[in-house]
Structure formats: C-alpha cells, structure tokens
C-alpha cells in the first residue's frame, strides 16, 4: 500500500488491485474507499488485460505502471497530492510500443461501489447530485435523491446538440450523469465530494452516480474508439477530487481556480454591454434594419450606453457558405462594420464555422467534407434551420483551411473584432472521422485553437453551443444557457404543451435555469453570457417575467446584450434596461444551488460609500402567484434590525426577523436591498437594480449630509433615505429640489447628468 498525505487529504493506493482510498482530514468521517481504476481498449486479440509492473514515489506523487500480456502496451497512472492543494490529482497515459494499432475506448478513472463513499459516520440519506451539462445549451443544476433527471424527448432533433454521446442518459429515479465535473452532496452531513477534470483537451469526461440506497460513482474519459498507432501515446486530462463544505458560498471556487490555471485562462475583459439583432429579427435582417437600430442606440447612448453592436444570423447566403451574401446584402458586411466603428461601437458578427445547413451550397460542392457516421451516412447535427443539419469533418486538411479562411475573412476583410461563434458542438458529434487517430475532444479543441489563432489575440470571441470544457482558455465570453426567447416556456409552430418541459429549447425559463445554476463559473473562466435581455412590450413575456430575466442577468454579473428593436422601445422599458448599468461584479451566491434544481434564492454582497449591503433576489417559479418569505437568519442576520427596499414594487420596510411578500406574480421576483438600521440610511433608488452602486460619496458632518451619485450615464429617478429627522432643506447641485418626508422615509427626485451632488441640512 502506497500513501500520500497533506493537511486536507490522506490517500492510499493498492497497485495490485488497482484501487485507491481517500480520507478527508477536514471532514473527519468523509472518505472514499477502494475506488478502482482501469483502461478499456481493444487489440486484434480482443480486450487487453493489464498487470502491475512497477512504481515510483516522491513526496508529492505516486506513479504506477501496468503492461498488457505482450508487454507492448504500457499504462501509467499518476496520483499527486501537493502540500498547498486540497485536491487529489489523477492522470492516466497509454503508450503503444507494439507494431499493431489498438482501439482505445476509455480511461476508467474510478468505479466506486455503493457503500464505499461516506460523508459522515451515519448512512447518507439526504443526498443530491450537481450535474453540469455537456455544452452551452445543456441543462445544468442539482437533483435530489429520488428525483429523475429531465431529458429531452426530441431524440434526433435535440440529442446530437446537447448530449455527449459518451455520457449515459440516466432515466431512473436517483440515477444522474454529468459532464466534465459534478458534486455528490450529503445535506445532513453538510459535506460534498467535488470531482472534475481540469480540462477537456484530450477527452470528454463523464460522471455517473446512483444515489439510492447509497451513492456509487463512476468516472471515465471517452476515447471514442481512437486508433492508437504504433509508437504513439494517448494521455488523459487531469481529474481532481475534493471534499467540500456544502454551505460554502463558493463551493466550486478552488476547483475553478485550478481549471483556470490549467487552461491559462485569458485575462478577464470588461463585461460587455451591447445590442444583438437575433431575438427581434431572427434571420429577417437587412442593412436598413441594422442601420435603423444603430441610429437608435446612438440616440439613447447617454441614457443606455452600449459598447458592442452585433449582427447575428441572416446576412450569409446559407450556413456553410460564408463568402457569399443574401441578395439584400449586395455590399457584404464591411460597409456595415465600418459604420458601426464610426458610430463608436465595437462591431460584432455571428458565424457558425463547424455546422452546415442541409441545403447549403457546400453540401453539393464538397460532400466529402461532411462528417460521417460509422455506417458511412452523413452525421446528424440536430434540428437547425427547420431541418436536420450536417457538420464539417475538421480532421480533413481542406476543411481546416476552410475554417481558417472563414475566420480570417470576418476579422481581417470584413473588419469585425468581435465574433459570436455558434453551434460549435458540431465538430464533436458521434461520428467516424476521416482521420481516426483523434478523440472528439481533441478535434474540437484543435478547431477552437485554429479560430483563436486566425482571429488573433486581440479579438473578442464569444463561444455559443460549445462543450463547456473545450472553450476554456479560448473564449473571452461563453454562453452558459439555452437560448432565451420572447416566450416563458418552449413552443414550436405555436404548439406549447408537447414542448413545455423540453429542457434545452429556447425560452426565458430555460435560459434562467442555467444563468443561475452556472453563475458559479464566473469570474474564474470567462465572462458568462446569459444570452440576451428582452424588455420590449410586444413579446409574450409578462412584465414579471421580464423583471425576472433582467434580475437574473443583473445579479449574476454576466454580459448585458439587449435584443429588441431599439427604435420602438418605450421610455419605461428603456429605463428598465438601463437599470442594469453599470454591470454588477460577478460574485453571486446561489443560496439554494444544491437544494433546488431551478434556484430561487440568490444574493450579492455589495459596498458603497455608506457601507455594506446585501442584494437578494427571491424568485417565484410557480405558475400562480404565491407569498415569498424573507428570513433574516437565512442570510446571516441574527436578531438584527434591518431596513429593506424592494426594487420592482418600491416597498420599504423595517425587518427584525422576517418579512412576507404577498402575492408575488407567477414567474415573478422580488429584488431586495437589505441594510442595517441606522438613524440616517441610504435605502436605494429606482436608478439601478442593485439600489446602491450609484452612491459614490456620503459625508455626514454635524447636521449636514452631502451625497454624491454617479452612474456613468444620464438618468432621472427617485432616491430613498431612511431619516429619523425631517430635513430643513435639500439641494441638488446648488438648487432646491423636490423632496418628501413621511414615516421616516425621505424621497428625493434626482436628475443625473452622469453624476450629481445632493446637500441636506437637518
């Protein structure tokens, strides 16, 4: 038995039985006992069997070597435990020293039998599983023991898009699966086991667990029947193991920091604020529509300042033919990008370089470029553009050059420095590559690296419809949710009931699901793209649903891109959109991340010139109005009197223990700014959802109070203060201003030309 120890973990491995155990030093009874590891590969003589041959050990690592009967196939398994890390690191490598090609199916990192994973001295009876979906649109969230993981029923239409072919689609109660990383949790013990691959450059990782009656666990890396040639080797990505406190407000922080370091994540960009054409016009765009919205955003720039203006799908001849345009775009894209730049915005354009529309010209001119199945048929990339689509085989050199030219053309010839790159999963379908010496993960990663290489280091790249692990270190922004839509629940061709529970179809509900459950990825990996903000009045979203979408986008700190006809927005809806600016920092705490599949309680701890406050969002995901309860103890305030202002209703209250919000609308939200009670307290405003970021200066001297407000934009609205004394006078920028004092609430009407100063005398 070989052992490694640090302050967090005691690790032991038995090379002969190919099993290891993990004991937590932090959580005394948490342990993983006798987890087995292996390799599945096929030779000309059948499945290869491996035997232990040698080992090496240092202070921080154990390296075990195994050989097959021919002694020509060498498997190395390396475990690392470093003094300053709370993880166990595990990695595998296969070398082919023989003269025959072998078929590699998967690296089996761990198989843990039921009863071998413990979180406390007692049997785990309140368990849950956090599941990360394969790509941007794949549903993510926590499932409780006894529940069933929701799956799409649209097999040929949706499955190729959202599910990794190597990850089982568990369907029974208490059976769950995840891609790249996951967490198994014991609510009673308040301990969880986080497992995850640090990258997905080599293989796509799969994690499967059955929670009842006791949790088991399987983890493997999919090698996709890769053909390992003589003299070649195949290595895995690194897997890490960590026991964690489930009450930690950032339970995945250490894991994502390790992922960030492994992938050399790009320096975080300023969170973009912009406009996108897709969710109002879809493919029905024209140069005049683009120019009309460009003029409109210029007119509202002082009230709603944007920095990105992005043209989406609809300009190209077809998806697959990127060097020709729709007849309505006779001059191509360069004139539009120049107009956008001249107007002061960063010009963005949509591309889908790996997928091919079924009726694309490319299908006829280069049928040999299309991905094939193992039966020789064209691989199905899912239901796109009202038909089943195709995909490109990136292992063909001519296809690689085609992708290079497509990116080069958009960035250099059309002069778009901001690219929204969509449907990228298509390079990694369940397929038979022309060159079978690569895994699907390797093919996709190389394709993404080609995109970054051709776009250049200064280009802003947004990945969409991309497997999560593949994009780390490549993209500045990454879509983390299903498409939003002007409808709350999915529908197609007007039909609602049969599509209502589809977890990945475009809808506001499905977008918000992942916006909240994947908010944990930021700021560690990229700027989260929660998809677009829709505030227009002529959609099928109710006002409470619009408020919920805006709240979810704002409180998670992701990108803000509006997708409405800007020339038609009412003043009220423009003010609603502007209330998200400036963008909040990306440091949300999803309180019920591990207890609800669709989280409903999320907060941010914020600070301004007067001090700290907590911003809390309470959502009602029911289809009818309900009462929502705010309990101070749940948010860390015990027997402390607090002041509260709710943004959407302007309700203000003193709270000592709890507060009930009556009849919160279906799919609605209450957004609460919570502050300690003081004789004079800034309660917030209707200028910004956070109700406090605008306060840049607060100076109280004798009986005089000076307040400085700054939003970086023009705005008109109302500021609220708690004051136990009525002021004698209130001035804004040296002039008397309208104010009202009643029941200790001081209401001030303010106008900001980006900033303003208010003087109060008591």
Where are the language model's segments positioned?
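Glycan-recognition and catalytic regions of carbohydrate-active enzymes
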Residues: 157, 528-538, 561-624, 652, ...
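Solvent-exposed beta-hairpin/edge-strand motifs
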Residues: 112-124, 633-649, 721-734
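Aromatic-lined carbohydrate-binding/catalytic grooves of carbohydrate-active enzymes
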Residues: 271-408, 412-434
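Extended acidic/polar, glycine-enriched regions
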Residues: 101, 187-266
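Carbohydrate-binding surface patches
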Residues: 175-183, 187-191, 549, 553-556, ...
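Non-catalytic C-terminal accessory domains or segments of carbohydrate-active enzymes
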Residues: 653-762
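Glycan-recognition surfaces
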Residues: 363-397, 401, 446-569, 593-597
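Polysaccharide-binding surfaces and accessory modules of carbohydrate-active proteins
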Residues: 2-9, 13, 18-205
């Amino acid at each position: 038995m070989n052992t490694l120890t640090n302050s967090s973990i005691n690790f032991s491995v038995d090379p002969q039985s190919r099993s290891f155990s993990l004991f937590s030093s932090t959580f005394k009874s948490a342990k993983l006992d006798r987890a087995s590891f292996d390799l599945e590969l096929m030779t000309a003589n059948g499945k290869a069997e491996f035997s232990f041959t040698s080992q090496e050990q240092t202070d921080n690592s154990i390296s075990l070597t195994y050989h097959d009967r021919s002694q020509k196939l060498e498997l190395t398994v390396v475990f690392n435990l470093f003094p300053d890390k709370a993880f166990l690191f595990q990695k595998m490598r296969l070398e082919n020293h023989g003269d025959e090609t072998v078929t590699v199916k998967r690296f089996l990192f761990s198989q843990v039998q039921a009863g071998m994973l413990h979180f406390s001295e007692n049997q785990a009876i309140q368990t849950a599983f956090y599941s990360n979906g394969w790509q941007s649109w794949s549903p993510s969230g926590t499932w409780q023991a006894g529940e069933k993981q929701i799956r799409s029923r649209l097999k040929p239409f949706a499955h190729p898009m959202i599910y990794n072919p190597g990850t089982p689609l568990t369907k029974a109660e208490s059976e769950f699966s995840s891609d790249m990383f996951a967490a198994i949790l014991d609510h009673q013990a308040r301990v969880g086991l986080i497992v995850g691959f640090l990258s997905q450059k080599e293989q796509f990782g799969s994690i499967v667990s059955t929670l009842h009656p006791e949790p088991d666990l399987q983890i493997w890396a999919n090698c996709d029947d890769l053909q390992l040639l003589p003299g070649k080797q195949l290595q895995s990505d690194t897997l890490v193991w960590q026991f964690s406190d489930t009450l930690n407000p950032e339970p995945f922080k250490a894991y994502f920091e390790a992922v960030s370091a492994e992938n050399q994540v790009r320096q975080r960009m300023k969170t973009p604020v912009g406009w996108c054409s897709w969710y109002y016009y879809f493919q029905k765009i024209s140069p005049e529509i683009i120019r009309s919205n460009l003029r409109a955003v210029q007119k509202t720039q002082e009230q709603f300042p944007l920095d990105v203006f992005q043209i989406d799908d609809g300009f190209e001849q077809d998806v697959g033919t990127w060097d020709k345009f729709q007849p309505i775009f006779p001059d191509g894209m360069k004139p539009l990008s120049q107009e956008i730049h001249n107007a002061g915005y960063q010009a963005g354009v949509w591309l889908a370089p790996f997928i091919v529309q079924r009726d694309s010209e490319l299908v006829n001119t280069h049928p040999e470029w299309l991905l094939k199945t193992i039966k020789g048929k064209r691989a199905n990339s899912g239901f796109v553009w009202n038909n089943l689509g195709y995909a490109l085989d990136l292992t063909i050199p001519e296809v690689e050059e085609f992708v290079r030219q497509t990116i080069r053309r958009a960035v250099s010839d059309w002069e778009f420095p901001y690219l929204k790159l969509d449907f990228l999963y298509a390079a990694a379908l369940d397929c038979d590559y022309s060159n079978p010496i690569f895994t699907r993960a390797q093919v996709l990663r190389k394709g993404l690296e080609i995109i970054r290489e051709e776009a250049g280091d200064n280009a802003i790249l947004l990945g969409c419809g991309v497997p999560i692990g593949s994009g780390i270190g490549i993209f500045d922004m990454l879509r983390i949710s299903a498409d939003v839509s002007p409808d709350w629940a999915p529908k197609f061709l007007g039909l609602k009931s049969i599509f209502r529970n589809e977890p990945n179809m475009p809808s506001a509900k499905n977008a918000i699901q992942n916006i909240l459950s994947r908010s944990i990825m930021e700021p560690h990996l990229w700027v989260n793209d929660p998809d677009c903000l829709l505030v227009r009045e002529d959609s099928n979203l109710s006002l409470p649903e619009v408020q919920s979408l805006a709240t979810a986008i704002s409180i998670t700190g992701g990108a803000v891109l509006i997708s409405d006809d800007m020339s038609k927005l009412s003043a009220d809806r423009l003010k609603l959109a502007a209330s998200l600016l400036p963008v909040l920092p990306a440091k949300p705490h999803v309180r019920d991340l591990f207890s609800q599949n669709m989280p409903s309680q999320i907060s941010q701890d914020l600070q301004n010139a007067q001090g700290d406050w907590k911003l809390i969002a309470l959502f009602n995901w029911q289809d009818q109005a309900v009462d929502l309860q705010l309990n101070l103890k749940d948010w860390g305030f015990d027997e402390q009197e607090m002041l509260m202002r709710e943004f959407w209703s302007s309700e203000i209250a003193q709270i000592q223990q709890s507060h009930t919000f009556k009849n919160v609308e279906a799919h609605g939200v209450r957004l609460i700014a919570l502050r300690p009670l003081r004789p004079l307290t800034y309660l917030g405003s209707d200028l910004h959802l956070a109700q406090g970021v605008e306060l840049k200066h607060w100076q109280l001297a004798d009986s005089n109070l000076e307040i400085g407000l700054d939003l970086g934009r023009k705005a008109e609205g109302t500021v609220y203060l708690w004051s136990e004394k009525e002021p004698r006078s209130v001035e804004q920028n040296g002039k008397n201003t309208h104010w009202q004092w009643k029941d200790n609430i001081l209401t001030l009407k303010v106008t900001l030309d980006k900033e303003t100063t208010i003087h109060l005398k008591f």
